[in-house]
Amino acid sequence: MDYSNFGNSASKKFQDDTLNRVRKEHEEALKKLREENFSSNTSELGNKKHYRAQERMSSPLHRLSPTGKSDDRKVKSPLDDKLRRQLREGNTRLPPPPFSSYGMPPTNRSNLDRIRRRTSSPVRTDKFASQNVIDDQRLEIKYLERIVYDQGTVIDNLTSRITRLESFILNSISDRGDKNFASLEHSRSFSGFPTNKTYGLQMGGLYENDMPYRRSSDNINKEGAREDRSSQIHIENESTEDILKILSSSFHN
């Protein structure tokens, strides 16, 4: 019997058996991890499921390593610099890590918890929720701006209508002249409001011979007796109350 390669063949057979067992465990763990976090059809995506320590496998690197280094449990993270940069730049799903990352002891946080936390991406959900709030606020601001614009349009239309009404009334009074049979009644306490026959009525007040009208004794004598004047003013399509409001506002201005 040739014993020259006995040690090498036995060692190789042991390593093959170990690798086959590790691959089988890795496939089972990978299948379990995909069912939890890498299925886009499940509604449970992102929920944290805590594993017990018995469910974790010991690291295959530790099983294949010499016995003197069993206490050294610090293994490099499966995320290299390229994947970390991609994770920072955009929320992309991470590929399954190499099997050497499985079975890490629960020091601080295990690799499984870290991968599960990053693939579930709760930050992405919060970001989308805040963006929806911002969009709703922008729509509300646009709606309020539209209301303000509509109210401004209504105010402009009312202002233009009032201006046209004032000009129509004042032109009607000044154009009638001798044909106007009406005048406003005034008492001694009132500073005086002349008849349209004697004084021309213009925007902003009363004028006599291109000069502002001022009440005096001459004006009183010029107007004649109080009983000779009518106490109402007649303008087509307008009430006396509206005319008095417009005339009083222009008189005070």
Curated annotation (Swiss-Prot):
Q: Signal peptide span per the entry? A: none
Taxonomic classification: Eukaryota, Fungi, Dikarya, Ascomycota, Saccharomycotina
| One of the Pfam families matching this protein, by short name | Spc29
Phosphoserine PTM sites in chain numbering: S65
Report whether Nuclease shows up as a keyword of the record. Answer: no
Compositionally skewed regions (Basic and acidic residues) per UniProt: 69-91, 211-231
Q: What family does this chain come from, according to its entry?
A: Belongs to the SPC29 family.
Q: What are the entry keywords?
A: Cytoplasm, Cytoskeleton, Nucleus, Phosphoprotein
Please outline how this chain is modified post-translation: MPS1-mediated phosphorylation at Thr-240 is required for spindle pole body duplication.
Q: What does this protein do?
A: Component of the spindle pole body (SPB) required for the proper execution of spindle pole body (SPB) duplication. Links the central plaque component SPC42 to the inner plaque component SPC110.
Tell me if Phosphoprotein is a UniProt keyword of this record.
Answer: yes
- Chain segments annotated as coiled-coil in the UniProt record: none
Q: Which GO terms describe its cellular component?
A: central plaque of mitotic spindle pole body; central plaque of spindle pole body; cytoplasm; nucleus; spindle pole body
Q: Ranges of Polar residues compositional bias?
A: 1-12
Q: What is the effect of changing T240A?
A: Lead to defects in spindle pole body assembly
The record ties this protein, via InterPro entries, to: Spc29 (IPR031392)
Provide the protein name.
Spindle pole component 29
A biological-process GO annotation: regulation of microtubule nucleation
- Molecular functions per Gene Ontology: identical protein binding; structural constituent of cytoskeleton
Report the subcellular localization.
Nucleus; Cytoplasm, Cytoskeleton, Microtubule organizing center, Spindle pole body
Cite the record's note on assembly.
Answer: Component of the SPC110 complex containing at least CMD1, SPC29, SPC42 and SCP110. Interacts with BBP1.
Q: Where is this region: Disordered?
A: 1-20, 31-123, 210-231
* Positions where Phosphothreonine occurs in the chain: T18, T240
Primary place of residence? nucleus
Q: Which organism is it from?
A: Saccharomyces cerevisiae (strain ATCC 204508 / S288c)
